[in-house]
Amino acid sequence: PFAHLYPMTLAESASTFAEMILTEGQLSNPDLNDAQKLAILDTETSNGAVFLTDLPVRFQFEKAFHEERAQGEVEVSRLKQLMAETQRGLFGETLEEGGEDPFFWASKLHFYITGVTFYNFPYTFGFLLSRGLFARFKEEGAAFLPRYEDFLRRTGQDMAEGVARDSIGVDLTTPDFWKGAIDTLLEPVAQLEELIDRNPGGEV
């Protein structure tokens, strides 16, 4: 009864699915040169990096903040510490010493949209859900489309788990679906690496 409005997770899924159709169509264009392919693949893989690293940092920080705020006021010094710790925890050794951005919480509007808490989470959820569904579409072809249309129709009638289960037949409560969605990024990464190797001087 509380799902009469479509959730942000499914809104992001639909928009990202459409982006993937466009990206796939562009990359299949035989007239595309290496520079154009490189630009498209760089965007796709860079987006993947943002959705799988930067946005989870935002979510984990916001979660930690809400937990501490429930106990009382959180000082600026503690906000900075929470942000730096979260960034270090997610990025690990890929983040150079002192490379944290402790004031990141102050520069992102999404943290201050009080009407939608944890606004960053739907982006990663929708990104991975759409990639998982697009992988099904590539496997099944046109036979997938009626179920995807049903998926879109059901938004606003149930939670994301129920919509995906009843329309597509996928279980979002198990790690396998999400792991498979992440694995779909391996192909564009490999294609990007091949293009870079083919043009070692950076001239494409």
Task: Describe each model-derived feature in a short phrase.
Residues 13-25:
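Signal/transit-peptide handling
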Residues 1-16:
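Post-HEXXH active-site segment of zinc metalloproteases
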Residues 3, 20, 28, 35, ...:
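C-terminal, non-catalytic "cap/extension" segments appended to globular domains
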Residues 41:
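Active-site region of PLP-dependent enzymes
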